[in-house]
């Protein structure tokens, strides 16, 4: 009985600790995945957006617009959303910390002109 009790405690701690780790965005290669909303290949990494659910499911999008529409259609509350820094596409920014602008000076994959930046200063050359 004592051994079974300790096995249960060990199993519970393992599950809890595995779920407490920091979740980070995945690096992709161009064309490796398709957008989970519109099914276009993700080829322009400046617009790559990722989200993860509270259950650990990860979704990839070719544009911020697709992620927003996906969330609204599914009526979901993601655990985390990351957007690519337009100026440095291998860098992800948590969406809540990103400066997102809409401009006709940027051609995003879905045509919405949305792009994410790390700071307000970075957006100045792209403002209408």
Q: What spans do the regions from the language model cover?
A:
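Bacterial N-terminal signal peptides that target proteins for export
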Residues: 1-9
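Hydrophobic helical h-region of N-terminal Sec-dependent signal peptides
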Residues: 11-14
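C-terminal motif of bacterial Sec signal peptides marking the signal peptidase cleavage site
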Residues: 17-19
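Bacterial signal peptide processing site
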Residues: 21-23
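Short metal-coordination and nucleic-acid-contact micro-motifs, chiefly zinc-binding Cys/His arrays
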Residues: 31
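Post-signal-peptide N-terminal segment of Sec-exported extracytoplasmic proteins
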Residues: 36-75
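Thiol/selenol-based redox catalytic cores and closely related redox-interacting motifs
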Residues: 80-128
């Amino acid at each position: 009985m004592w051994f079974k009790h300790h096995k249960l405690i060990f199993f519970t701690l393992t599950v809890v600790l595995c779920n407490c780790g920091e979740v980070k965005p995945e690096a992709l290669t161009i064309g490796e995945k398709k957008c989970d909303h519109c099914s276009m290949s993700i080829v322009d990494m400046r617009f790559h957006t990722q989200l993860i659910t509270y259950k650990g499911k990860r979704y990839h999008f070719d544009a911020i617009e697709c992620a927003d529409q996906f969330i609204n259609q599914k009526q979901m509350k993601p655990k985390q959303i990351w957007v690519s820094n337009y100026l440095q596409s291998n860098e992800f920014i948590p969406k809540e910390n990103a400066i997102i602008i809409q401009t006709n000076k940027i051609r995003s994959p879905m045509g919405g002109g949305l792009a994410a930046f790390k700071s307000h200063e970075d957006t100045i050359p792209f403002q209408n």
